[in-house]
Amino acid sequence: ESPVQVRRIAALDRGNGPRGGGDVELESFDNYLQEMVKGLGARVIPHMITGVENRQNMPFLKYGDGKGAQYDLVAIAAGVNSNIIKMLGDVPGDYLPPKTTRGYICEFRSTREEILRVLGRAVHVFLLDIPRFEFAAIIPKGPFATVVMVGEDLDQDLVHAFLNDPVVQRVLPTNSVPCVCSCAPLINLGARKRPYGNRVVMVGDSGVTRLYKDGIGAAFRTGKAAATCAVFHGVSSADFEKYFWPTCRNITNDNRVGKVMFATNAIMKNSRFSRRAMLRMAQKEQKNKTSYPHMSTLLWNMFTGSAPYLEMFRGTLRPGFIYKLAVSLGASLWPGRKQINKREEMA
């Protein structure tokens, strides 16, 4: 439940959406954005890019039909799963792809009524004591339920361990709902080099993005910074260093705090007592609407990306948070207390 009693999550489809989802009434988010920018004057050229070269200190794009064109500036707004990432070795600056890990996404299809009955209108987030498991979420989208997983060296064994966990089965009995499509996309964990060169700049997932969070938010911020630099200052590597990189650096520094927070979360979720304390603290906050929802706000922001990691970390240093967490930890350790189920879901 949102700690501020408002709905702030929009569940949407990328590209063509799930396999077999052609009858879904909403258009894809990608198409919506493309049509919007076309209405603002952008020109869409439907060419497949098969190569990126540096000719006479200018970027040259090779097309699938054998032709190509030279450009004053090339902004790469592709994801880390795009083939164009592998074509950038010849661009100035010796671009290296970001560090990545694999996630897992699976679409389960039922009926709109059944998904609403089982999942309601809430995103369900799971913190389970499974080796190599970081976190997962189940998101209702009309007749579909989207399962998103993040973990270390994620493989089919880890996927099956999560889907067959009793806590997950209580929320979504995956054995009785067909999985219509799945994929294991790469996730950006951080840039290995500066995401720019002379007349070439990477925005969004191909460059710097927020750790485990919405790519479009970081793409907007870095895209705006790149456009501002190009229009008002220039397109050289030095220009991007001075006017574009500070935005990327802020995201990178915030991600360092995020890594610390996720490492702390991994330690706490693997302890039965700390899991109980987190759950008890969040439950008490949900019941008592007059007190500040410290844990609820932290969990909400951690898994929705509604706040920077630095802001979340500062929230954990508030006396109220520390006091309530200490009380909840003490209650979890107190013998004879009513036990919360051994495996908890944090949703």
Protein language model features and the residues they cover:
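A conserved beta-strand/loop capping segment in the N-terminal third of enzymes
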Residues: 1-32
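Short amphipathic alpha-helical face segments that pack within enzyme cores
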Residues: 28, 32, 79, 218-225
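Predominantly flavin-linked oxidoreductase catalytic cores and closely associated redox partners
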Residues: 36-173, 209
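FAD/FMN-dependent oxidoreductases across multiple families
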Residues: 51, 68, 153-230, 235-238
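Mobile, glycine/GP-rich and aromatic-enriched active-site lid/loop segments adjacent to catalytic centers
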Residues: 129-133, 139-161, 167-190, 197-198, ...
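C-terminal helical "tail/cap" subdomain of flavin- and related membrane-associated enzymes
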Residues: 231-347
